[in-house]
Amino acid sequence: MREGERWVVLGPNGSGKTTLLSVASMNLWPTTGSVEVLGERYGRTDARELRRRVGFAGSAIEGAMRPDLTPTTLIMTARHGAFEPWWHVYEDTDRVRARELGARMGLADHLDQPFGTLSAGERRRTSIARALMPDPDILILDEPMASLDLAARELLLADLEALALESRPRAVLVVSHHLEEIPLGFGHALVLAGGRALAAGPCESVLRDDILGEAFGLALTVERHDDRWTARMRRRS
């Protein structure tokens, strides 16, 4: 990914998406090859410091959040990469930023509720606001639309579209199973299958019937209407 680019990673279950994210976020050591993140070579730099420049949000992060803590606290603790508020000292500016990020992600009316009482969409928004707390250079979102209903999905898509227009984070990567979940402003795509990349580049050249059909093992029709992508199985004649 280059500065200013917004990428989507697509592929079926077992294609390697989670493994790729784990390596890119420096939580899994590669068995072969080399990895460079923000100009630093993995293994030749302090991964703990570099991780602070990579924001990560997904269901695994949400599962580690204490249900009795509020979104404000859970967002704020990301300032030090923690989940508990007891081990670090926080300034008033940290609390203000946490509340601003929460409000920006549509949580203004829920910032003081226990996390465990939030809806799936509100939990997802908390996770994303938390990932933005350290002002990362790269933001990685692992299936941000998973388990959301239609309204929650569309509202979150609109927020991610607004985020894509901003200068920070410098690059954003979203992982998904569905073309319908690609936000506007995401202009590049990587398609994985069987642990390898089938295609990578501008969406127009990658999101094609043949490439996605090979990835998912189906005859697909890929279309684009009003800048939103869709894919459906081709009917048998």
Describe every region a protein language model picked out:
Residues 135:
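Conserved catalytic motifs of ABC-family nucleotide-binding domains
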Residues 33-43, 50:
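Conserved ABC transporter NBD signature motif
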Residues 89, 114-118:
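Conserved ABC ATPase signature
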Residues 215-237:
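ABC ATPase nucleotide-binding domains
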Residues 25:
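Helix-to-loop junction immediately C-terminal to a conserved catalytic motif
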Residues 139-143:
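Catalytic Walker B motif of ABC-type/P-loop ATPase nucleotide-binding domains
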Residues 187-202:
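H-loop (His-switch) and adjacent beta-strand-loop-beta switch element
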